C-alpha cells in the first residue's frame, strides 16, 4: 500500500503474512526495517477486491428544491410504441392547475397532462440515485456487451436547470438463482439491472426498486381530469349537441356575486353550477392518439370562453368509438383520450334538464 499526500513523502507499507494465532499481520514500511504487528482492522481495507472501493452512494446529487428545476425527462424503452417525453409546463400554465398538482405534460403524446403524484418518481428518480453493486470500472466493449449495454433496453435522459443533462442507460437484468427444495427446480429472481450513468466510467448494478422508468407508461402517469377551468375565469360556455346546435351560456360576476344566462334569460344559479361541475367531471380513462375516421360520429362538444384577454378558447369534442362503449375526446383539435360513452349521453340529458 502506498500513501500519498501533499505534505509528506510517499510511504509504502508492505503487508506480509498473518501472524499465527493472532488477528494481526506483519507490516513494515519502505523507510524502515522494523517489522510491526498490525491488527486486522488496520489493514483489512487493503485486502478487498478493487471494485469494493468504488463509490455506490448518491451517484447524482440529491434534489434541491430551491435550485433545481427539471425541464425535461425522456424515457426510451424497447417495449414502448414511442418514447415518453415529459416537459415542464410554463409557470403561467402550471398556475391554472395549482390546486390539482399539474406541472408536466407529455409532449410526446399530444401534450396530455401528467399527474404530479403519479409521475414523481419518473421525474425526480435520478436525483440521489445509488447503486447496489459495481460490475466494472473503465469497462471494455466486451464487458458492456456482457451487461447488455451495447444494445440497452432503457435509456433515461433528464435535463435540469435548462442545460445540465444526466443520462442513465440500463442493460440486462441481474439474477440470483435458488433451488426449490422439493422439486429441485431452479428459480431465477431479478435482483438488479446493469446500468451506466453519464460522467461515470463504470457499470453499476441498480436495484429494481430504484428504476421506475422500467415500468412507466403514459397511462399510469395520466392526469385524468384533463381540463378544469375555474368557472369565474370564464365569460361563457357553449354546449353543442349531436347536430352541432349551439347552446350559449353567459357567466357574469365572481364567487361573491354571480349570474348565469341563456338566450338573455337568467338560469337558476345552483342548477347551472351543478351542470358545470358535471362538465368538469369527464374522466380520461385511457390515452387515444389515433386519427378520427368517418366512422367516428360527433356526439357533443364544449367551448370554454376565457375571460382573460388574449387567452384562446378551449374546445372539447366527443366522438363515437366503434370498438367499445367509449367515446373519443378531442381537445383543441388533438385526439387525446377515451371516456365512457355514458358521459356524453348524460351531458346532453343534463343540458336538456337545465333548459
Predicted segments with their positions:
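Soluble, acidic/polar mature domains that operate outside membranes
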Residues: 1-355
Amino acid at each position: 500500500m502506498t500513501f500519498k499526500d501533499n505534505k509528506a513523502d510517499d510511504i509504502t507499507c508492505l503487508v506480509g503474512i498473518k501472524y499465527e494465532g493472532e488477528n494481526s499481520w506483519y507490516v513494515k514500511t519502505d523507510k524502515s526495517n522494523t517489522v510491526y504487528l498490525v491488527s486486522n482492522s488496520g489493514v483489512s481495507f487493503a485486502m478487498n477486491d478493487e471494485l469494493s472501493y468504488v463509490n455506490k452512494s448518491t451517484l447524482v446529487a440529491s434534489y434541491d428544491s430551491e435550485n433545481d428545476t427539471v425541464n425535461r425527462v425522456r424515457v426510451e424503452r424497447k417495449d414502448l410504441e414511442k418514447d415518453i417525453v415529459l416537459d415542464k409546463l410554463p409557470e403561467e400554465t402550471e398556475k391554472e392547475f395549482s390546486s390539482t398538482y399539474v406541472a408536466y405534460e407529455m409532449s410526446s403524446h399530444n401534450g396530455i397532462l401528467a399527474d404530479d403524484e403519479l409521475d414523481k418518481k419518473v421525474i425526480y428518480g435520478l436525483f440521489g440515485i445509488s447503486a447496489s453493486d459495481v460490475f466494472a470500472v473503465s469497462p471494455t466493449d466486451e464487458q458492456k456487451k456482457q451487461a447488455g449495454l451495447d444494445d440497452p433496453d432503457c435509456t433515461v435522459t433528464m435535463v435540469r436547470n435548462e442545460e445540465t443533462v444526466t443520462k442513465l442507460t440500463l442493460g440486462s437484468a441481474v439474477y440470483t438463482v435458488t433451488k426449490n427444495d422439493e422439486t429441485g427446480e431452479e428459480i431465477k429472481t431479478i435482483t438488479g439491472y446493469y446500468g451506466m450513468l453519464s460522467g461515470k466510467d463504470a457499470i453499476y448494478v441498480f436495484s429494481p426498486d430504484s428504476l421506475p422508468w422500467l415500468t412507466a407508461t403514459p397511462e399510469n402517469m395520466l392526469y385524468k381530469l384533463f381540463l378544469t377551468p375555474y368557472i369565474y375565469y370564464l365569460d361563457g360556455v357553449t354546449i353543442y349537441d349531436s347536430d352541432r346546435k349551439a347552446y350559449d351560456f353567459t357567466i357574469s360576476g365572481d364567487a361573491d356575486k354571480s349570474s348565469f344566462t341563456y338566450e338573455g334569460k337568467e338560469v337558476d344559479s345552483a342548477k347551472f353550477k351543478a351542470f358545470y361541475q358535471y362538465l368538469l367531471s369527464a374522466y380520461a380513462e385511457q390515452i387515444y392518439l389515433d386519427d378520427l375516421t368517418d366512422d367516428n360520429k360527433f356526439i357533443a362538444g364544449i367551448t370554454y370562453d376565457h375571460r382573460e384577454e388574449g387567452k384562446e378558447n378551449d374546445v372539447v369534442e366527443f366522438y363515437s368509438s366503434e370498438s367499445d362503449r367509449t367515446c373519443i375526446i378531442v381537445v383543441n383539435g388533438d385526439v387525446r383520450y377515451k371516456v365512457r360513452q355514458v358521459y356524453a349521453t348524460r351531458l346532453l340529458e343534463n343540458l336538456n334538464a337545465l333548459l
